[in-house]
Each structure stands twice: as C-alpha cells, then as structure tokens.
C-alpha cells in the first residue's frame, strides 16, 4: 500500500526513470518540487518543455544544440583537421572543460556492445566516415576505457585505416572500466597529450 496520492506516485515513478535516480532520490525530488512556490515549479516545467522542444542534435557532429550546425562546428577558430570521437554529448562537455583540445567532435551516441545487442550499425560510425575529407588529418578516439569503448575504438580504427587518416587513442590515465564523464581535468589533459596511434 502506498502512502501518497496517485499524482505524487506518478511523479516519483517518472523521476526514478532518470539515470542514477533510485526510488528514494525520486521521492526526495518529488517532495522538494511540491514544496517549491508555484512560480518556481512553473519555471522548472517551462524550462524542461522548452529544452525538449528546442534542443536537437547537430547534423554535423551529433552534439546537443539549439542551432544547426552547433557552436563548436561553426566556430572558425576550431582546428578542422582533428576530430575527437566520443560516445555521448556529455563527453564533449567533459573534454571542453580541459581546454586542451581545439578540434571538432563526433558523437557516436553509444558504443558497440554485443551483450546489449548494439552493433556498429547502431551508432554513428557511417556519419564519421562521411566526414573524412582531405582537411581531416587525425581522428582521436576518446571512447570510454571499458570493454565496449575499447571494442568501439578498435572497430573505428579498422574502418578508418584505408582512408589515410591518422587514428589515435587517448592514453592511459583514465581507469579501465571508468567513464570519461568522471575523469578530472588533469587526468583527461594528460590522456589527451599522451594519445597513441592505433
């Protein structure tokens, strides 16, 4: 038997669908929102609906954007000869915090994971290959240092090998099985500096 009205239970259920949010955290978030002034709740809801309605993926790199192409792809000061390949848009935010990389990005929107039924056709590898031109000299593979990230990096390296582009992998320093999102700036900076050709 639940102690909350149906509307509260539904909100808890929706929050619990978010990554890293369990039932207790979902309950705390729900109760916090219900205790906010009405105008703050309206602003929160408005921001959520606006973000969902206006944010899309950049047609070039796959990052989140409200303009197409995104601010990074359309920035004339970015080094167009280097593309850093990441698994998710959040990884771009992590890389940008380091302030060591001035090239372009490519978001795969996942990784190769046979255990989860994801193959190369399920992520944005074809789109990466389509971006290869004479201007691109290096592709840095910054997939996560876990089994899926390594498999994805090796597959991409194999696909790009005949295209006469240098393919490098970020260096050690990111723990195996770790997630790029949780790496500190110094570690990520060193991993980028020490990248190896594959």
Swiss-Prot record:
Keywords tagged on the record: DNA damage, DNA recombination, DNA repair, Metal-binding, Zinc, Zinc-finger
Residue intervals of the Toprim domain: 81-175
GO molecular function annotation: DNA binding; zinc ion binding
One GO BP: DNA recombination
Zinc finger annotations (C4-type) as residue ranges: 58-73
CDD domains assigned: TOPRIM_recR (cd01025)
PROSITE patterns given in the database record: RECR (PS01300), TOPRIM (PS50880)
Family annotation (Pfam families): RecR_C, RecR_HhH, RecR_ZnF, Toprim_4
Disulfide bonds listed in the record: none
Task performed by this protein: May play a role in DNA repair. It seems to be involved in an RecBC-independent recombinational process of DNA repair. It may act with RecF and RecO.
Family stated for the protein in its record: Belongs to the RecR family.
Designated name of the protein: Recombination protein RecR
Organism the protein comes from: Clostridium botulinum (strain Alaska E43 / Type E3)
Gene: recR
């Amino acid at each position: 038997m639940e102690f909350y009205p149906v509307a509260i239970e539904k909100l808890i259920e929706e929050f619990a669908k978010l990554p890293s949010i369990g039932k207790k955290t979902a309950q705390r978030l729900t109760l916090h929102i219900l205790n906010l002034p009405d105008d703050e709740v309206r602003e929160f809801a408005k921001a959520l609906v606006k973000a969902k309605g206006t944010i899309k993926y950049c047609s070039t790199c796959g990052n989140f954007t409200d303009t197409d192409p995104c601010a990074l792809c359309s920035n004339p000061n970015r080094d167009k000869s280097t593309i850093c390949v990441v698994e998710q848009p959040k990884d771009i935010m992590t890389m940008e915090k380091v302030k060591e990389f001035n090239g372009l990005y490519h978001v795969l929107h996942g990784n190769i994971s046979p255990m989860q039924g994801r193959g190369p056709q399920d992520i944005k590898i074809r789109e990466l290959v389509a971006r290869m031109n004479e201007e691109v000299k290096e592709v840095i593979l910054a997939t996560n240092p876990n089994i899926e990230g390594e498999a994805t990096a090796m597959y991409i390296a194999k696909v790009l090998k005949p295209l006469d582009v240098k393919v490098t992998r970020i260096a050690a320093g990111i723990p195996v099985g770790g997630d790029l999102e949780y790496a500190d700036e110094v570690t990520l900076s060193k991993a980028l500096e020490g990248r190896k050709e594959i």
